[in-house]
Each structure stands twice: as C-alpha cells, then as structure tokens.
Amino acid sequence: MVRLRTLVRAIAAASVLTSGMAHGLGLGEITLKSALNQPLDAEIELLEVRDLGSGEVIPSLASPEEFSKAGVDRLYYLTDLKFTPVVKPNGKSVIRVTSSKPVQEPYLNFLVQVLWPNGRLLREYTVLLDPPLYSPQAAASAPQAPVSAPRATGAPRTPQAPAPVRTTAPAGSDTYRTVSNDTLWEIAQRNRTDRVSVPQAMLAFQELNPGAFVDGNINRLKSGQVLRIPTEQQMLERSPREALSQVQAQNQSWRGSRNPAAGTAGARQLDATQRNAAGSAPSKVDATDNLRLVSGEGKASKGADKGGKGDSKAIADTLAVTKESLDSTRRENEELQSRMQDLQSQLDKLQKLIQLKDAQLAKLQGQLGAEGQGAAQPNAALPDASQPNAAAQAPAQPGTPAAAAPTPAPAGEAPAAPAQPPVAPPPAPVAEKPPAPAVPAPAPVQAAEQPAPSFLDELLANPLWLAVIGGSALLALLVLLMILSRRNAQKEKEEAQAFAADAGEEQEDALDLGKDGFDDLTLDEPEPQVAAAAPQVEKTTAQTSDALGEADIYIAYGRFNQAAELLQNAIYDEPQRTDLRLKLMEVYAEMGDREGFARQENELREIGGAQPQVEQLKSRYPAMVAVAAVAGLAGAKLAQDELDSFSLDDLSLDDSGHAAKPDAAGQDLDDAFDLSLDDLGGGDLGSDDVQADLKSDSGALDDLTLDSDLDLAASTAADKPVDDLDFGLDFAELAETPSQPKHDDLGDFSLDLDAPEDKLSDDDFLLSLNDEVPAAAPANNEFTLDTEAAEEPALSLPDDFDLSLADEPTEPAAPEKGEDSFAAQLDEVSAQLDELASNLDEPKSAAPSFSAEDAAVASALDGDADDDFDFLSGADEAATKLDLARAYIDMGDSEGARDILDEVLAEGNDSQQAEARELLERLA
C-alpha cells in the first residue's frame, strides 16, 4: 500500500513537471511618485495578469515570519502601507502602494506578498525618498540676481547663471548629463540590471563620479554634470546589504546637515524673490541695505555732498560688485574643472575599451590562424577596420579638451562653448565608417564560429522536453527502488527460513545436562504453583483484529520475541483460543524456549481438543521432545523430595476401634493398615476413603499405593537418636477397661512435630506382623490402632521404621497364616506403584493435617529422612535415564546420551545395564 502511494505521488510530480508551459503571475519594478515628508505614492507593476480580476489578486504586507526569514526589519510605520490592486484588462496592471501619513524616513525596505488562485508571490522592495524638487544649484544662483538686477551692471549677468544648467546634452551612450530635477535614485534605477539593487547602482555612480556630488553625498547631486554609467560588474562589487547600510549612513548625514543649510538657502531665496517680485519692494529695503549704495543718486550727490563721504560710498559699491563678480567667476571655474575631469575620465574609459577590443581581436586572430590560412585573410582585415574607428574616436576626444582650453577667457560664455564640441564629433566617425569595407567582416566570422544547434542545445532550450525527461527519470528511479525493496524483502524472507531451519541445531547446544544435573531438583517445602505476574513492560498489541496474521509477519522477518509478545497479549484477551496457543508453541520452538513450549502444551491439554496439532508440532520440532523426559525426571525427583518431607501431620485419618481385649498388650498394625496416596490427594482420609478388610486369618495392607516402589522392612535396629524426620503419632488415651470398641475419627489424628522427643525402645512400640487378629474382630475400613492405655501412656515408632519394598526383612518373624496374604498384597502394591509412575506429571494436592481429639498427646520419634521414604530408588530412576538417553540419541547428542548410559550401568539392574550396553554399542 505504501509503495502504491509512493507511485501515485511520483506520477503526480511528473505531471506537474510536464506542465512547464503554464504561465504565472509576476511582480515587476516599483515606481515612486512621491517625495520625502509626503504620503507615499508608488506603483508595483504586475506581470502576466491575463484573465485575473482585481478580486483574485490580493496584495498585502508580508508576515513577521517572512520578514525574519528574509533578514529585513519589520518596522512599525510599515503597517501604515496600503496595497490596492489595479487590474486593467488591456492596459498596464499595477499595485498601488499608499500611506495615510507622510513618510519621514529617507528610505523604505519592505516585503510584498501577493496571493492569487494558483499560488503566492513574495518580493522585497527598497524605496529611496528624495526631498521634493531639491537642487543645490538653484539655491546657489539665487543670490546673483538681486545684486545685479537693479542696475545695468547686473543685466548681462542674469542670463549667465542658468546657462550651464540648461545647455545639457547627452555626451554618449555610456554617459548621462544631469538636469535640475534629476535624482540619483532615478538615474540608478534606469541604468541597473535585474541582478543589481538600487543602492548598489547608486554607490557605483558615486564612486565613478565623485565630483558630481556636493560634500560627497548621494542626496546632493549637481545638475549639469556628465555622469559615467558604471558596468554591472562594478555595481556588484558591494553586496546588497553593505550597499544599503552605506546609503543609510549618507541619508542620516544628509538629514543632520539639511536643516541649517535649508534654512540659509531658504532665507536667500526668500530675499531674492521679494526683490524681484514688485518694484515698490526696494524702496522699503533701501533704508537699511545696499540699494542705496548702488543707486544713481550716488553720482549726483557726489558733488553736492562733501567729498570724503561720497567717495567712500562709491568705493564700497564698487567693491561689492567686484566681489560678486569674483565669486561668480570662481564658481564657473570650478564647474569647468569638474567638466574637464569628467571628459578626462571618459577619455580614459574609451582608451580602455579600445585596448579590450584590440585584445579580443588578437585572440580571434590567434584562433583563426590555427584553423587555417584561408580563414586568416578575412581576419586580417579586422584590425585594419577597427583602427579607423579607434582613430576616429581618439581624435574626437582630444579635440574636446583642445576646444575647452580657451574657455576660461570668456568667463560668462565659456560654459556653452564646450558643450557643443562633444556632440559634434560622434557623427563624423559615423560618416567615415561606410567607406571601410572590412567592418562587416567580423559578422561572418562570428557566424562561422557558432555551429548549428545540436540536439542537446535544442533539448535544453525546450522546457517541455526537459519536463518529460525529468519525469521519465523519476519514474525509472521509483521502479528501481521498488525492485530493490522487493529484492531486500525476499532476501530477508530467505534469511528467516534459514534461521528457522538452523534453529534445531542451535538449540541442541543449549540442552546441557551433566552427570549431576538432577541433584538440584530438590524442593524442601513444595508450594502450590502460582502463575507469575506479567511484567510491566510495553505491550506489543495487534494493530488489526487478526493477531495470527501479524504474528506470521513477525515470524517471516525473524522477530520471534515480538511475535511471542503479541500472541501472549492476544491469549490474555482470549484465553480459550487454541490456535493462538499453537502458534505460540511454534514461536517458542523457533526460539528454543522449552519451558514456554511445555507450559503451553500443558495449557492445551487442560483446554482439550488440540492434541493432534500438539503432536504435529512435536514431530516438527524433535528438540522439544526432550522436555518431556526432563519433566518426568524432574517430577520424579520432586515427588521424592515431597515424600522425604512427608509427615503424618499432613494426614487426616479416621480411626475407629473395635472391641479389644483388656489384657492385650497390643494390636497387629498390619491387620487394618491401609495407606493409599491416591486417597491422600483427595483430602481427608475418612472411613469412606481408606478401605481395609480385616480378616481373622490374615492381616494385610490392602491398598498401599505410593508414587514409587515401596519397601517395607521390619526394624530391629538398636535405639538411636532421630536426625531429620520427626515421625510422631499422637494417640488419645483409651479408657482403662473399654467394654465396647471405640470408633475413633482419623480426621483428628495429628502429627505433633513440636512434642517433646521421648527416646523409647523397640519394646515400647512393636509393629508386629505375626500377631493374629482375633476371630471375633469384625472387618473394618478404618485405620485401627489398639493400645493399652493402662500399660503404655505414649507410644512411638521405632527409629528404623522404613517402608521399603526393595529390601526384604533379613530376619522376619515366624510367619503365620497372615504372612502369605501380606506377600500377595505387596505384589498388588508394586503394580499400583508402576501405574502411578506413569502419571507423575499430574501431582496430587497435599493432604490436610489431622488430629485425634480423644487421644492423648504422645511423644514423637524422629526418623532418618534419608531412610524413611525412598520411593524413587532403584529401577524406576534408571528406566527414566534410559528413556532420556534414547531421546538424546534421537536428537543427535551422543555425548549426553553416553554420560546418562554410564550412570545407568552404575545404578541400574541387570536388564537395564544390558539395554544400556546395547545403546552404547549403537553409539560406538
């Protein structure tokens, strides 16, 4: 599914790439229509508007995040800007940028965001605001008018001041002559390229024309100056940010010095306009200023007044006029010098261009000469053709300084004269170019160098083909990735299968049972098994309802731990599902977890209905079969340990006594001794549970059933202290002369381990198999012990009381008529023990303790734990080891099988030893 989505996305991307011919909305340049200290009025050109309406184009100021990404400060006064789209169907469409308040900042730098149906546009704009109609020359020429206007002396000087301003003409294609209303911002904006910002172009103009600015400030451009236009490379010498910071510094410097200068200029302009506005104005000013000194009345009153006073006034008037003329001459000289510098710089630039052209021609000659002599002849005409052009340009420029040299003499008319010669020389070389036949020669040479466009050039020039090729390459790449992913998935699957195949071999090493491997299987105090609490870890839950499907995916990739966790969680939710448990058994088999395998097998056995599938799993994973043998041996050892710690305190028996002879010393215990472990597992051993038939001619153990072979031996050993097992019987005191048999409840028969130990001899308590049961004694199913309360206050078992069928009594008592029946019953006990040995995996629950309320507390005797109940001795343990050795042989573990067979040779009987030797011969 993921691959399909990736393919769909790739096709969508390819379709987007193929639509390269679609046109989109664009933003052009900004045109400023306002000045400093005025409300902003500007227009941004809209490109490729086509059928869009004004409602579909939504311009606005960019968000603060976009400003921060672009590295531009979003100042507060920018929020006053309003953007209004003006979409014209057949005309020029623009975005009007206006503000409601006057803009007092010398420049504005902001980001414009335009939203339209097909996308979004974002562009940065920088606007430099100049003062309205500011010109330094106008303020400088104003004082000349009032000095010369009132009389004939100033008449010829009035038209001379604006002469250099109005006689403007372009000096060439690489230069520009300023006029009174020009600003450096507009000049730089017209002559820059798209790669160059306006501040970069302004600083390049200032660097090439330092004399065209007052005090070296870009805001004080002189009018009538010939500016050299910088190239794009010169404009790009500074970064946009560096150029913007320098422009800001010059703007701040200009603003700091603008107020006093403007005040002085304004005062001078105001004074001049008052004097030229009306004829009556000079009469009011004459009382205090120079009008009286330059008036004609000074000559008339020269003879009438006293001589010293009239002469001083005339001299002062002449001195003032002379100073004014000197000041005017000085300014004209400075202006002429600046023009001379501009011409000289222009001449230097032309010479550099000529050198560059010569170098290019020389390079072309070298290239053509290497190709052949035929191509060298047309190339030879190129320098000849270019030399007249260079010669025509060179004399034209020296001619201008020659004509300008005599200009300082006519102080007033000199500025107009040098302005004409630079204009006249350019047409002269144009007229001389047609006679030169070699000039058009470079065109064929250049055309010959450009070969016909190749297929690659046509391909690169066609965006549609580029989009198709790009989409095809992308699709091919996606197909390749899909093939690689499938190959990797197949490889992982093969690795998982190989891992599953080798799992059996890897698990054989984990099964290491040494010679003493069963010595640790001891349980001193067996407790009921309680399921362990699930660990508090993050559960791997099924993403879908099919937990088996997800588990199969994990198994295919070899992630057995995650599969096991997933199945365990699913079993926790649905414990009755056998298919989940079977899958979990398979995962445990792959992981080599024998305990988990056996645990799930037991769970399935309890649930039922899945035994054929379990057998199939066992056949598929023979390594797990050894678990059964190990479990059987472990169960046998566990049962032995439980019987080692067996005490009569754990039994609850009902004893019922019948009529006994008052003078009897004791009763035969084997008359009614019935100990069945099958009944012990059920709870109380009452009258219904323990069944015994006491007959007059035989006393036997009817249903003596144990978990292993039981050896019963008569104990005749000497008295010795009890070490491990306290085997005590608490008997109730009987009446001195009971007339009727008393029915005692064996449920109250208890074993007191804390009772004081009395060391009694064998004579105190004699377990006799020879005493005859009285003929009058009726048969009873109860466990009956008849004691003489008068003679024995407390009875105890002998120290060497051992129920072992393996060892026969060495010195049995003289057999009487009950001895034959006892031997027959021993055979029945052996058969029952064999039957119980096959069901060791189903242990019975522990029997509850019991006590006798009517019996007195008797002292308990301790018995040796090692000799009390030896149920797992002899042939059964050796047979189990033989079964385990066969399982090892089936798994291929020869060393483990050989070790176990050696133990059987040392511990087993003759038949088992013979079978062990046969297996060893097969291994050899």
From Swiss-Prot:
Subunit (UniProt): Interacts with FimL. Interacts with DgcP.
Comp. bias regions, Pro residues: 418-443
Biased composition (Low complexity): 140-150, 390-417
Region described as Disordered: 140-176, 237-312, 372-445, 799-858
Compositional bias per record (Basic and acidic residues), positions renumbered to this chain: 299-312
GO molecular function ontology, one term from the record: structural constituent of nuclear pore
UniProt source species: Pseudomonas aeruginosa (strain UCBPP-PA14)
Entry protein name: Motility hub protein FimV
Coiled coil feature spans: none
GO biological process, one term: mRNA export from nucleus
